[in-house]
């Protein structure tokens, strides 16, 4: 919460009334990853839960694969990457099942003390 408060104070000219909106467009807000890939109760799920999230948008090219494995996605890559964490193992399994990564938009409304859209 401290980071939200610091941004709230620093960007005071961007508030609407006493509310500041924080908007995010990310693969980290893609609901199927939250459900099946991110470790249960982990930081990525906690991050997701801060937001009101829009409809998920699948991306069959899996363009954010590199963010996890530092290489471009290809079906062959699934057998070559090092799946040494729960998230990496879950993502490889998820993609081998024919599912794809994607993205969504999220918003947080903060009033200077708390997130008010939860």
Where are these regions (language model features)?
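Conserved acetyl-CoA-binding loop-helix of GNAT-fold acetyltransferases
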Residues: 1-11, 22
């Amino acid at each position: 919460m401290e980071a939200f408060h610091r941004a709230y104070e620093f960007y005071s000219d961007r508030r609407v009334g006493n509310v500041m909106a924080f908007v995010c467009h990310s693969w980290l807000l893609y609901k199927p990853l939250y459900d099946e890939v991110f470790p249960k109760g982990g930081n990525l799920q906690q991050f997701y839960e801060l937001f009101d999230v829009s409809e998920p948008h699948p991306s069959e090219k899996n363009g954010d694969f590199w963010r996890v494995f530092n290489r471009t996605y290809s079906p062959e890559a699934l057998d070559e990457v090092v799946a040494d964490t729960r998230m990496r193992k879950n993502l490889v399994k998820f993609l081998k099942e024919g599912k794809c990564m994607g993205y969504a938009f999220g918003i947080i409304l903060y009033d200077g003390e708390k997130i008010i859209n939860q």
